[in-house]
Each structure stands twice: as C-alpha cells, then as structure tokens.
Swiss-Prot record:
The species this protein was found in: Gemmatimonas aurantiaca (strain DSM 14586 / JCM 11422 / NBRC 100505 / T-27)
PANTHER family referenced in this protein's UniProt entry, alphabetically: ELONGATION FACTOR P (PTHR30053), TRANSLATION ELONGATION FACTOR KOW-LIKE DOMAIN-CONTAINING PROTEIN (PTHR30053:SF14)
Family: Belongs to the elongation factor P family.
Keywords: Cytoplasm, Elongation factor, Protein biosynthesis
Name the UniProt record assigns to this protein: Elongation factor P
Main location: cytoplasm
Record's keyword annotation contains Protein biosynthesis: yes
Lineage: Bacteria, Pseudomonadati, Gemmatimonadota, Gemmatimonadia, Gemmatimonadales
Signal peptide extent: none
Cellular compartment(s): Cytoplasm
Length: 188
C-alpha cells in the first residue's frame, strides 16, 4: 500500500531500499522558503541498524506487508531460542542476534508476537510487563518508605533493575521489558 511521506507515523513499518524499516521517530517541518519535508529516524529490521532519512513531502512511501503470529517460548539451547507457533504448532528457532535486547527476558511459557516479512521472522514484541523474582538486593532499611530513593536489584534472569528501598530479596516484581523499569510488586 503506497501513501504520501507526510502520513509517516511512529511505529509504522515501511519498505525503504528494499528492506523493511520501522519508524522510530519522525518530524514534519517546513524550513523557511523551502518545501515541506519529513525527517525520520528508521530501524532496518533485517540488519538491525538505525539511520536517518529525509523524505520530501511529495515522496511516495510503500508500507511493508507484515504478518503477526503469536509464539510461545519453549526453551533455550546455547545461543538458540526455541518457539512454538500457537496457531499451527510449528517450531521456530531464533538466535541471540534475532532477539536482540529481548533475549534476557525470555522465560518458558512466555507468549510473544513475532513479526514476519516475506514469510521470515524479523522481530518480536514482548508483553508490556513481565514478572520476575529478585534474587539479590540490599537488605531493607527501617524507615525506607519515607523517602523515594531506589536501590539496584538483580532479577532471576540476570538483569539488574532499580527498585524502591522497601523491596526485599525473594519478592516477585513486575518489570517493563522495553525500558527495564520496575513497575510494582507482583500480586500472585
């Protein structure tokens, strides 16, 4: 589907020089007496590289024909992560490079959305929050609820996040995997 460059929006996936690229940021502006343009920061989903490109307002952009499938993470074997398609039970293997920053957040049974372009998986979307147990953190200090300070805590997946002072070791917490921020204590 083709559209004008002025219709570019954040999160949109378009075809640029034959590769699918996600729009990370964009800015529409008209400098002085020049023609309108759209400055966009793009991420190439095939190579993983980020770059900027300036589109003229009259440029025609092609939206990438993407498919999305729900996958369930089964297990990790070395650098390979094994998934099962929840719709047709097909098995799929992705490596560390394909998962990128999402790799440490994988836990058995986790359901993710995989994006496919031309029948090949090119990216995944994690849920907005995941639950992990804190395996290491400083002990609770009396009166810690009076101040809004935080302390580092190591999760069971090895990732370190900042948590409020009142959170102790063994507590299950919800974390936003895209930002690595503590959300709240899990209500199990």
């Amino acid at each position: 589907m083709a559209f004008s460059a002025t219709q570019i929006r954040r999160g949109m996936v378009l075809v640029f020089e034959g590769d699918p690229c996600r729009v990370i940021e964009f800015r529409h502006h008209t400098p002085g007496n020049l023609r309108a343009m759209v400055q966009a920061k793009l991420k190439n989903l095939r190579t993983g590289s980020n770059f900027e490109h300036r589109f003229r307002a009259a440029d025609t952009i092609v939206k990438a024909d993407m498919e999305t499938h729900e996958l369930e993470f089964m297990y990790q074997g070395g650098d390979t992560y094994h998934f099962m398609n929840s719709e047709n039970y097909d098995q799929l293997e992705l490596d560390d490079e394909a998962l990128g920053d999402s790799a440490p957040w994988m836990q058995p049974g986790l359901k993710i959305l995989a994006e496919y372009y031309n029948g090949r998986p090119i990216g995944i979307q994690l849920p907005n929050s995941l639950v992990f147990e804190i395996v290491e953190t400083a002990p609770v200090v009396r009166g810690a609820t009076k101040t809004a300070s935080s302390k580092p805590a190591k999760l069971e997946n090895g990732v370190t996040v900042n948590v409020p002072e009142f959170v102790e070791q063994g507590t299950r917490v919800r974390v936003n995997p895209s930002t690595g921020e503590y959300l709240d204590r899990a209500k199990d």
